[in-house]
Amino acid sequence: MTIKRKCGIIKTERRKGLKNLKGVIPLAYKSIIALGRQYGSGGREIGEKLARLMNVPFYDRELIALAAQRSGIAPETYASIDETATNSLLYALSTGAFMFSSHFTSSVDLPLNDKLYILQNKIISDIAEKEGSCVIVGRCADYILRDNPNCVSVFVYAPLEQRIERIKKKDGITADAAESKIVKTDKRRANYYNFYTNREWGSITNYELAISSYPLGSEKTAEMILEYVKYREKVKSE
């Protein structure tokens, strides 16, 4: 097959075996995917693959970098407390101790954990408003964007056995060490989510779509989520 390029357009003398042209042109999506995940389920990888399939921005640890830029605090400092809750934010909220904005004005010195949550809350809201379609992993994005009609809340899970095996291979540790890491990480994420949202992390009633990454694997799971997004957008446009 000979392919010629003319004036920036790819032309072919033989179309057999080529993908449908519609499959080459990126679709313009409206959906914002807020993706929660169990540790070891491959949620981050699935989110990255989904963002590539949709040709939209992907945000996970990138939110830490954005928070650091806005606050002037080192990214390493925020990374060490990311998705970790404290018990002081509700008190500050009840006393009106701070203003919800990109700058903090407070009579109470909020811990960095709470400042990071507030700042990421603002960043996620700004991203949804200004950038539109994207994939956001964790950080209570499903709750923050709960009133946004374009937000699709997704939770990725997998059987414990498969998660243990994944973390074993990824980190080069024993099965016992992998299980311990999974339990601790999931507990930290649950505490963070439950505290800041007053919801139950991982409860399927809090998500529009809950999907197991096993046995499909990350690629097929991302494709399944995308099919749901496509159908959802079609239904909403009718």
In which residue ranges do the predicted regions lie?
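ATP-dependent small-molecule kinase phosphotransfer cores
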Residues: 68-133
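Glycine-rich phosphate-binding P-loop
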Residues: 35-48
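Conserved phosphate-donor/acceptor-positioning beta-strand/loop module used by diverse small-molecule
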Residues: 147-171, 175-183
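Pre-Walker A (Motif I) flank of P-loop NTPase domains
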Residues: 29-37, 132
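Small-molecule kinase domains that catalyze NTP-dependent phosphoryl transfer to phosphate-bearing small molecules
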Residues: 87-93, 174-218
